């Protein structure tokens, strides 16, 4: 027991009973109480105390199941009110008690006082005073305690309290109901509304016996969604507790036993009712989980009405802290770094219906399996034709629908990946093939769990696990709920309808079938297709939905590096850049919807033609990225000009297949200026910077996407491996990375080193300059150097104009240009070259208005008169505009024509 105290007294008098203390655990009846001590490292000891000198009615007792002829014993009058009086007064309270008598059978009789000493309320006297117990007959009032009991009884009689009231007390006898004929109907009739109840018995931490009020149904309630360690019954009838079973039972007893609670009846299982017990101090289900006394169980967690995710979170809390039953717990992803547990990646391929291939920010590829789901399977595989080759995608019911759902939803998109567990590699057995190590994860896009969406459409099923198997989806309950909905609604695999059949003809390499299809495909013009496989940069396998066939497709007009091939007796090595070309094509078109134009076929039955993705010609893209060369057969194609233009641009960059390209020397012929005509070939550019001397920097719009991709990859790389401050020693002329005022990193070139705190840099892709401390600089990785992508900012000057020498006038002109064209797209045409930079005319993209001519019209600049014949028409237009500005006395001309006297002095020429 918790503690004891010895009352004082003279050594010569009668022995004074020892005062002991405890906490009321349970009230057995109006005169029998169980007292327990304080817990110390486990459930405390307990003892039954029978109140001395009084008697209360016996509570109802159910007949023993081993005695078929026995009958249930009902409550005696006023027995239940007496029990309730003590229950409400004493449960969980600290009391003190004395033992006055102990029988040979071990029954103890004594007095119980509410509080810490015998000055507290005498429980026996209170019972008698309320008319809920009587003084035992035959007891002689020979001591003060018995005298007080007699007085209390007389007072109760006089006040007609309890059993001394009129009537026989039959209204206090409960109509106890030990069985329920239809538990399911009983549960449903309460519509999951809380029912008042008293917990009468705790079998283990998660199973209790409850008295439902006001109808007195005595039912066994199992807590929904969890299971505590239990007591295993041995052959000799004894019970052996599982680890922490006794502790879990005490945890529930100390909080719920004989407490007033509310129970939500949620379902039933084997005549036992599943429910959730609500107490003002909290939810015992969640508390048991959080303290490590229970684990979640899949078979009943779905009926838990207060949110299964709360139970999983509570269990996870205990697991992470290795509390009690989880003391030896090891997380499925314990060996993974946080960056490997959660990351964002781009989906590159869908593998059947339960796995995807993603591209990480590092550029690496990784296969991710969707946690806890199983793709459609072929039923009755033993009955299949052994000679027929199985094509899972088309022959397994709903596999194609599942793959298409994932393909359309995910391909090319960025998804959030949360790794749930790593399934280790397993060797092959007689019935199960070998499996390599698998990374299983929850994949979401736009907040949607892809596995859950698949299951809800009936395109996958949920794997059932052993209860102790923790390697499962972190959203396993949602998957189970989604599957239940799919079954209820008859979706997909759970449908009673006829299974969809996909009759897809594979004519790859079948020359005869290919010849039959060729005329149809040629006449069809552009046909829709899905790229199913990429063999090399220019060789693909396509699925044509309208024709429901698979074909091998070769890109026309190009010569792509050949990959490695396995030949009889040897392996033929691939040509340089063959792997890069294959990867380029894969990343661009694999499992994408494309359009194809079939022109012809080869001897092996492979179709030859043009493939378009998002309006771009794949052949042209491969040539543009220096991964293919133009083939002479392209001459008769309408795409020949585009191919040649792309090849010429690739040659100039001298990358990949053109890395060793040497331009053939051409004898230079000086043209006669009078015979040359002005060439007007405007190209789209993006103006990024205007300098103080009215030069400007532009980016080529056609290569803008390459720059965006490089910047994204570079910043991801920097985020993963940030430069160490001060570790970079800048040198003049060196390329580096610099952190701009917006906090982002850009490619730059060191122009001047004044001191470690003053480094002059030039941003090579934008044309602006800045002075920075060396702490905001870092080494430029070779993966993002100018060899990978040349500097994108090119400097130009306006043709046909003279920039004012006066500082204020020049500032006005620069400000006007900044307002009009900085950070906008324009059209640029190179007019003539000079020692500094090319001189160009620039047009607004929308109105096609000449920017330089506009400056002349505003009187902000003067015309530079050139003598070349091809420019005379343009010069005349500029001079006319200048005369108009002069007449209107705009800006430079506001004081008239100043050039007559001081033109030479100020650097102007007429």
UniProtKB/Swiss-Prot annotation:
GO terms for molecular function: cadherin binding; endonuclease activity; endonuclease activity, active with either ribo- or deoxyribonucleic acids and producing 3'-phosphomonoesters; nuclease activity; RISC complex binding; RNA binding; RNA endonuclease activity; transcription coregulator activity. Phosphorylated by PIM1 in vitro. The modification N-acetylalanine is found at residue 2. The modification Phosphothreonine is found at residues 103, 240, 779. Ubiquitously expressed. Residues 729-787 form the Tudor domain. Its EC number is 3.1.31.1. Transmembrane segments: none annotated. GO terms for biological process: miRNA catabolic process; mRNA catabolic process; osteoblast differentiation; regulation of cell cycle process; regulatory ncRNA-mediated gene silencing. The modification Phosphoserine is found at residues 426, 645, 781, 785, 909. It catalyses: Endonucleolytic cleavage to nucleoside 3'-phosphates and 3'-phosphooligonucleotide end-products. Endonuclease that mediates miRNA decay of both protein-free and AGO2-loaded miRNAs. As part of its function in miRNA decay, regulates mRNAs involved in G1-to-S phase transition. Functions as a bridging factor between STAT6 and the basal transcription factor. Plays a role in PIM1 regulation of MYB activity. Functions as a transcriptional coactivator for STAT5. (Microbial infection) Functions as a transcriptional coactivator for the Epstein-Barr virus nuclear antigen 2 (EBNA2). Forms a ternary complex with STAT6 and POLR2A. Associates with the RNA-induced silencing complex (RISC). Interacts with the RISC components AGO2, FMR1 and TNRC6A. Interacts with GTF2E1 and GTF2E2. Interacts with PIM1. Interacts with STAT5. Interacts with SYT11 (via C2 2 domain); the interaction with SYT11 is direct. This is Staphylococcal nuclease domain-containing protein 1. It comes from Homo sapiens (Human). The lineage of its organism: Eukaryota, Metazoa, Chordata, Craniata, Vertebrata. The gene is SND1.
């Amino acid at each position: 027991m918790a503690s004891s105290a010895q009352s004082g007294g003279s050594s010569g008098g009668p022995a004074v009973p020892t005062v002991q203390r405890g906490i009321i655990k349970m009230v057995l009846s109006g005169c029998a109480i169980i007292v327990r001590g304080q817990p110390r490292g486990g459930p405390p000891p307990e003892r039954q105390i029978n109140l001395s000198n009084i008697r209360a009615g016996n509570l109802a007792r159910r007949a023993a199941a081993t005695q078929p002829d026995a009958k249930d014993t009902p409550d005696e009058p006023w027995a239940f009110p007496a029990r309730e009086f003590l229950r409400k007064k004493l449960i969980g309270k600290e009391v003190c008690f004395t033992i006055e008598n102990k029988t040979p059978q071990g029954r103890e009789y004594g007095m119980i006082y509410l509080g810490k000493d015998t000055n507290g309320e005498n429980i026996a006297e209170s019972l008698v005073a309320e008319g809920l117990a009587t003084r035992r007959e035959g007891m002689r009032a020979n001591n003060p305690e018995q005298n007080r009991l007699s007085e209390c009884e007389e007072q109760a009689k006089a006040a007609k309290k309890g059993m001394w009231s009129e009537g026989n007390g039959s209204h206090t006898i409960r109509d106890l109901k030990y069985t329920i004929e239809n538990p399911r109907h009983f549960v449903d009739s309460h519509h999951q509304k809380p029912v008042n109840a008293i917990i009468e018995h705790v079998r283990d931490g998660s199973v209790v016996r409850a008295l439902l009020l006001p109808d007195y149904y005595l039912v066994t309630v199992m807590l929904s969604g969890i299971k505590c360690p239990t007591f295993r019954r041995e052959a000799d009838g004894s019970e052996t507790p599982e680890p922490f079973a006794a502790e879990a039972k005490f945890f529930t007893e100390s909080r719920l036993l004989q407490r007033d609670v509310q129970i939500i009846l949620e379902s039933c299982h084997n005549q036992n009712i599943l429910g959730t017990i609500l107490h003002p101090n909290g939810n015992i289900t969640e508390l048991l989980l959080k303290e490590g006394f229970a684990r979640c169980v899949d078979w009943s967690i779905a009926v838990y009405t207060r949110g299964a995710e709360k139970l999983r979170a509570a269990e996870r809390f205990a697991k992470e802290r290795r509390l009690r039953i989880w003391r030896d717990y090891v997380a499925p992803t314990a060996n993974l770094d946080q960056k490997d547990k959660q990351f964002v990646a781009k989906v590159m391929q869908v593998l059947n219906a339960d796995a995807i291939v993603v591209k990480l920010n590092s550029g690496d590829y990784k296969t991710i399996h969707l946690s806890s789901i199983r793709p459609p399977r072929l039923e009755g595989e033993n009955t299949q034709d052994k000679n027929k080759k199985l094509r899972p995608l088309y022959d397994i019911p709903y596999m194609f629908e599942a793959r298409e759902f994932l393909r359309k939803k995910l391909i090319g998109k960025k998804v959030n990946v949360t790794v749930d567990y790593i399934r280790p590699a397993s060797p092959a057995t007689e019935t199960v093939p070998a499996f390599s190590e698998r990374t299983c994860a929850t994949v979401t896009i736009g907040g949607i769990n892809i596995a859950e969406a698949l299951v809800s459409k009936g395109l996958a099923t949920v794997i059932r696990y052993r209860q102790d198997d923790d390697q499962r989806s972190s959203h396993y309950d949602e998957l189970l709920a989604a599957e239940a909905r799919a079954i209820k609604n008859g979706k997909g695999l759970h449908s009673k309808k006829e299974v969809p059949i996909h009759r897809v003809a594979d004519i790859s390499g079948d020359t005869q079938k290919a010849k039959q299809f060729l005329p149809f495909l040629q006449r069809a013009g552009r046909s829709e297709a899905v790229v199913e496989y990429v063999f090399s940069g220019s060789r693909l396998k396509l699925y044509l939905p309208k024709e429901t066939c698979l074909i091998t497709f070769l890109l026309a007009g190009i010569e792509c590096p050949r990959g490695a091939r396995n030949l009889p007796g040897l392996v033929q090595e691939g040509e340089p850049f063959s792997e890069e070309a294959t990867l380029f094509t894969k990343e661009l078109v694999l499992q994408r919807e494309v359009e194809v134009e079939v022109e012809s076929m080869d001897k092996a039955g492979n179709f030859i033609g043009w493939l378009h993705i998002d309006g771009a010609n794949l052949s042209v893209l491969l040539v543009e990225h220096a991964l293919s060369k133009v083939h002479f057969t392209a001459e008769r194609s309408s795409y020949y000009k585009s191919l040649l233009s792309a090849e010429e641009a690739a040659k100039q960059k001298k990358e990949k297949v053109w890395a060793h390209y040497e331009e053939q020397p051409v004898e230079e012929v000086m043209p006669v200026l009078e015979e040359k005509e002005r060439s007007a070939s405007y190209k789209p550019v993006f103006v990024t910077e205007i300098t103080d001397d009215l030069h400007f920097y532009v980016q080529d719009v056609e290569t803008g996407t390459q720059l965006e991709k490089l910047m994204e990859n570079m910043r991801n790389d920097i985020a993963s491996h940030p430069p160490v401050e001060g570790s970079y020693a800048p040198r003049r002329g060196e390329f580096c990375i610099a952190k701009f005022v917006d906090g982002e990193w850009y490619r730059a070139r060191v122009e001047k080193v004044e001191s470690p705190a003053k480094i002059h840099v030039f941003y090579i892709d934008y044309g602006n300059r800045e002075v920075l401390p060396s702490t905001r600089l870092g080494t430029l990785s070779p993966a993002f150097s100018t060899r990978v992508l040349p500097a994108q900012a090119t400097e130009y000057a306006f043709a046909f104009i003279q920039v004012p020498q006066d500082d204020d006038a020049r500032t006005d002109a620069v400000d006007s240009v900044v307002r009009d064209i900085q950070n906008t797209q324009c059209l640029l045409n190179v007019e003539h070259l000079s020692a500094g930079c090319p001189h160009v005319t620039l047009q607004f993209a929308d109105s096609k208005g000449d920017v330089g001519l506009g400056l002349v019209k505003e009187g902000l600049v003067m015309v530079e008169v050139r003598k070349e014949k091809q420019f005379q028409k343009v010069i005349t237009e500029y001079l006319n505009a200048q005369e108009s500005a002069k007449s209107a006395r705009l800006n430079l001309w506001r004081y008239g024509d100043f050039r007559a006297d001081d033109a030479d002095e100020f650097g102007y020429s007429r």
